[in-house]
C-alpha cells in the first residue's frame, strides 16, 4: 500500500535511486496504490551524470510492495521492499534494465515491456 509521501526504491537503471510518491493516477481521491498502479513521484536521490536529476517530477509504475498481494488461487506474495520502475507518458520504461523480481499481474495490465526486461516474474 503506497500513499503520498511514501519513499520507494527504483528497480531500473534510469538514474534515479529513490522516489517519493506525490499522487496516485487513476482516481481523484484514491488513498492507496498497489502493484501495477501508476503514480506521480519526485526523485529524492539520483545517480550523478544521468538524464534523471534530483527533484524532477516523473511517472512510475509500482512493481513491488511490502504489503501482501493476494491472488485468486489463494497464493499470497510479499516482497522485502517497495519499488517502482520509471516510465514515460506512453508507459514504456525509461531505463534499459529492470532489477529484482516483479509480479505477474503487470503483464495483464499491459506493461509487457517491463515484464520482458525483468530477470524474474513471480
From Swiss-Prot:
Function: Binds to 23S rRNA.
Broad class of the protein's primary localization: plastid
Protein family: Belongs to the universal ribosomal protein uL14 family.
GO aspect biological process, one term: translation
NCBIfam families (UniProt xref): rplN_bact (TIGR01067)
Chain segments annotated as coiled-coil in the UniProt record: none
Recorded GO CC terms: chloroplast; cytosolic large ribosomal subunit
Localization per record: Plastid, Chloroplast
Signal peptide interval: none
Molecular function terms from GO: large ribosomal subunit rRNA binding; structural constituent of ribosome
Keyword line: Chloroplast, Plastid, Ribonucleoprotein, Ribosomal protein, RNA-binding, rRNA-binding
SMART domains reported in the protein's UniProt record: Ribosomal_L14
Record note on quaternary structure: Part of the 50S ribosomal subunit.
Protein name, entry field: Large ribosomal subunit protein uL14c
Amino acid at each position: 500500500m503506497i500513499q503520498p509521501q511514501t519513499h520507494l526504491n527504483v528497480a531500473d537503471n534510469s538514474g534515479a535511486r529513490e522516489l517519493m510518491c506525490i499522487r496516485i493516477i487513476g482516481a481523484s481521491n484514491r488513498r492507496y496504490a498497489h502493484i501495477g498502479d501508476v503514480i506521480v513521484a519526485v526523485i529524492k536521490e539520483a545517480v550523478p551524470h544521468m538524464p534523471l536529476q534530483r527533484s524532477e517530477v516523473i511517472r512510475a509504475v509500482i512493481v513491488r510492495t511490502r504489503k501482501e498481494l493476494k491472488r485468486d488461487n489463494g497464493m499470497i506474495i510479499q516482497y522485502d521492499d517497495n519499488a517502482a520502475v520509471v516510465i514515460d507518458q506512453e508507459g514504456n520504461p525509461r531505463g534499459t534494465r529492470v532489477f529484482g523480481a516483479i509480479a505477474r499481474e503487470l503483464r495483464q495490465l499491459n506493461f509487457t515491456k517491463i515484464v520482458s526486461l525483468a530477470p524474474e516474474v513471480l
